[in-house]
Amino acid sequence: MSNGSTTKTKKIIGIDYSLTSPAICVMSGDKLNFYYLTNKKKYDGKMSDNIEGQLHDDWDNPMHRFGLISDWVFYVLYDLHEGNYEIFIEGYSYGSKGQGLFQIAENCGILKYRLEQDVLSYKTVVPSVIKKGATGKGNADKDMMYEAFLKETKIDLKKIFDTEKVGNPISDIVDSYYVAKVGYENSTSNKS
């Protein structure tokens, strides 16, 4: 039903950004869609009506890899969910260490730079704030996060992915949901 208005519903985007299994949650009204990248062929494609995975593209060097991952984010935003966005990205975990920390930072830096270039503002949400918003505990583990997600959304990802454990991409999908939800709730409560 259209009232002739060209205004589009604001889409709340939650991005759990990583090198191996990034995930995006798109909230539009009461509709949820989830996207993720994976290295596992069995998780490539549509897992359900609102959950879709895609295999990582081949890459030649780290910068090429980071560019491909950010290309995927823009594919989800522009090709699958064009519109008015409020974007939230999970912040860095202070537990990250070693050489991998630099690649994580470079990877996310490229995404943030590209979002800025396209005049798409974003906010970061601290991991402990996400966990506390989901479970009431800032140090919640993956299983606690999953149980909160299942209770809240009624989406049984273990059943959909035919697995007993909360690994990738399940934990990434859960995190992307709470990045969007907690980020949005915190940003609206800070405006009052």
Stretches with model-predicted labels:
Residues 1-192:
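Phosphate- and other anionic-substrate recognition elements at nucleic-acid/protein interfaces
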